[in-house]
Amino acid sequence: MAAMTVHLDIVSAESKIFSGRVVSLQVTGSEGELGIMHGHAPLLSYIKPGMARIVKQDGSEEVFYLSGGILEVQPSTVSVLADVVMRAKDIDEQAALEAKRRAEAHMANAGADFNYDAAMVELAKAMAQLRVVETIKKNIAR
């Protein structure tokens, strides 16, 4: 029997990154981890910066970094809309480490007019990219 699938579109501000049938999607929503499969109840949620993992019809997995965004689940279609989407293999680990270092330095040297929220957002994005890179490294090592 064929696996039950749902159509998934992952779209960034620049282009459509993925479009196809998937068995499952895992993302971090505003209220925690979400696992989306065929038959999931309709849902609209914010997505936190982090990893999106999909399992395709053939059983293969693909991992993406999302800068945050919106998830919409409908009976036959799931849509992920994000400002920035990167395939895990395309993440520059050194650039993410540098962004993390810069955000931490800004926070440590904060003045009276410092925008703490913006620094926390930048730090969260850099940390999320690094978590995606680490996940890929662990999966390759297996």
UniProtKB/Swiss-Prot annotation:
Q: Which residues form a coiled coil?
A: none
What the entry lists under InterPro entries is as follows: ATP_F1_dsu/esu_C_sf, ATP_synth_F1_dsu/esu, ATP_synth_F1_dsu/esu_N, ATP_synth_F1_esu_C, ATPsynth_dsu/esu_N
What GO CC terms are in its UniProt record?
A: plasma membrane; proton-transporting ATP synthase complex
Q: Where is the signal peptide?
A: none
According to the lineage, what is the superkingdom?
Bacteria
List where in the cell it is found. Answer: Cell inner membrane
Task: Name the cystine pairs.
Answer: none
Q: Which UniProt keywords apply?
A: ATP synthesis, Cell inner membrane, Cell membrane, CF(1), Hydrogen ion transport, Ion transport, Membrane, Transport
In terms of Pfam families, this protein maps to: ATP-synt_DE, ATP-synt_DE_N
Principal localization reads: membrane
Which protein are we looking at?
A: ATP synthase epsilon chain
